[in-house]
Regions:
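PLD/PLD-like phosphodiesterase catalytic module centered on the HKD motif
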Residues: 1-118
Length: 118
């Protein structure tokens, strides 16, 4: 089994956005678990997500209401995609949800990005 670890340092050449786009374009399915989704961030991925929808590449996204950072406008936009299964975890004061994981299913392997770009 080939092991290929990589540190994403958010330079001009290698940053989280570019890695997400690259892996989305290469995958057969994708799974995101992210604490927050805002519309401005989602806009950066819209063209790629539309391309995936046209190719019938399925994805699942789970996010949360944790700290009220997720924007309803972003969720509404994601719901327009027929290939994306969107789930929203309703957080409360006792139970938070602050994950940042991106999983890309390929024919022979999975690629996983864990962490934040901030």
């Amino acid at each position: 089994m080939e092991e290929n670890n990589k540190l994403i340092i958010n330079s001009k050449q290698s940053n989280l956005l570019n890695e997400l786009k690259k892996n989305l374009k290469e995958c057969e399915r994708f799974y995101f678990s992210v604490a927050f989704i805002n519309f401005s961030g989602l806009q950066l991925l819209l063209d790629t997500l539309k391309e995936l929808e046209s190719r019938d590449i399925k994805g699942k996204i789970i996010t949360t209401t944790y700290l009220n950072f997720t924007e309803p406008k972003a969720l509404e936009k994601l719901q327009e995609f027929e290939n994306i299964d969107l789930k929203v975890f309703i957080a409360n004061k006792e139970i938070g949800f602050h994950t940042k994981a991106y999983i890309f299913e390929n024919k022979d392997n999975y690629k996983i990005i864990i962490g934040s770009s901030n």
